[in-house]
């Protein structure tokens, strides 16, 4: 698949896969920034893109940032729809007790291209019964003593 990329910032880098087997490609910051402890920051990537119809870009947390710095993409995965043409930006949450410093060119998230499907919604009077029923949060986890 070919994805058209428009650089709108002089520090923008074209995304690339780090290995042949990588499903995600790196997204790089175009500006220096500091995200304070227990705070959220919006990080510019400096690119716009054009995806084929039927695909989305998912913006995901880099595992190293999560493990080593407790920094994650807040709305992970963030969704970039195929008809969006604005700048890609990443919402990062710093869950740590330390400042998180971002330098120009830092890999701050990863992108994964995914196929999308359109559902047809059909209103009905009642849904089929299942063994789970309406059991929600935690209902299939640890048993209650």
Swiss-Prot record:
GO terms for biological process: dUMP biosynthetic process; dUTP catabolic process. Its cofactor is Mg(2+). It comes from the Bacteria. This enzyme is involved in nucleotide metabolism: it produces dUMP, the immediate precursor of thymidine nucleotides and it decreases the intracellular concentration of dUTP so that uracil cannot be incorporated into DNA. It is an enzyme of class 3 (hydrolase). GO terms for molecular function: dUTP diphosphatase activity; magnesium ion binding. Keywords: Hydrolase, Magnesium, Metal-binding, Nucleotide metabolism. Pathway: Pyrimidine metabolism; dUMP biosynthesis; dUMP from dCTP (dUTP route): step 2/2. The keyword Flavoprotein does not apply. NCBIfam families: dut, PRK00601.1. Its EC number is 3.6.1.23. This is Deoxyuridine 5'-triphosphate nucleotidohydrolase. InterPro entries: dUTPase (IPR008181), dUTPase-like (IPR029054), dUTPase-like_sf (IPR036157), dUTPase_trimeric (IPR033704). Substrate binds at residues 62-64, 75, 79-81, 89. It catalyses: dUTP + H2O = dUMP + diphosphate + H(+). It comes from Helicobacter acinonychis (strain Sheeba). Pfam families: dUTPase (PF00692).
